[in-house]
Amino acid sequence: MPERFLGIDTSNYRTSAAIYNAETGEWVNRGGLLTVPEGAIGLRQSDALFQHTVRLHEKIEALPQGEVRAIGVSTRPRAVEGSYMPCFLAGESVARSAAHLLSVPLFTVSHQQGHIAAAALSAGKLDLLDGEFLAWHLSGGTTELLLVTPDGKTVRVEKLGGTSDISAGQLIDR
């Protein structure tokens, strides 16, 4: 079986699906921003969930076809107790169903863990994930300094500091 992996993320402002080929190091990402109504300052979770439900199949169908070895999906904003947003249910539902039908492992991660892995991948430094390092995470309502340590097939994230006001992460997402 080829070393291809499917990743899915349905955060509050973007629907994303990607294929990563571990043999070649190549990846194909099909993502798109959700529509925020003119004059609005954000999206309600119900509206984000609806848009993901309508768009996710289009993102997946735009990926190159072929077998996948496993599926990864973001299921919550952060890997901490009580971290929850309904918009992640769209991606989780599709990923769980696909993993079951294809008889492949499903890896659930937080959106934050996905950002960290995506940054390492896009920098060509996946080996960073094999050791401890510091990372700045700017996303949505957060600007945080994190201690990242390997944890099996994913990473453990400890918040060392961050902002308590409107963050730079909002500027990036909006």
Residue ranges and their predicted role:
Residues M1-R174:
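Short acidic/glycine-rich loops and adjacent helix/strand connectors
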